[in-house]
Amino acid sequence: MTNWDPNHPSLRSPIAPHETACVLRMHRAGYKGRATMKILKLRGTRLMNQMQRALDAETHAARAGRPIHDALIDPKKVK
């Protein structure tokens, strides 16, 4: 296994892959808003703000031609 540094400068590059935010991955995995709010301990307005920011960031990455990493959330592993 290689050492991986999450703070490596190449990950801040404008061409670095985009990782989709958790709230958007949960939505795509079928979680309803109420369940997402409970799991992440968010209020409704905060959840909607984070969803909007996640969608904006993903749209910006797609327009820039950057790869998008969108791993699914496994409901069996959620506590």
UniProtKB/Swiss-Prot annotation:
Q: Which domain of life is it from?
A: Viruses
Enumerate the residue ranges of region (Disordered): 58-79
Any idea what this protein is called?
Gene 68 protein
Species, as recorded: Mycobacterium phage L5
Q: Taxonomic lineage per UniProt?
A: Viruses, Duplodnaviria, Heunggongvirae, Uroviricota, Caudoviricetes
Gene name for this UniProt entry: 68
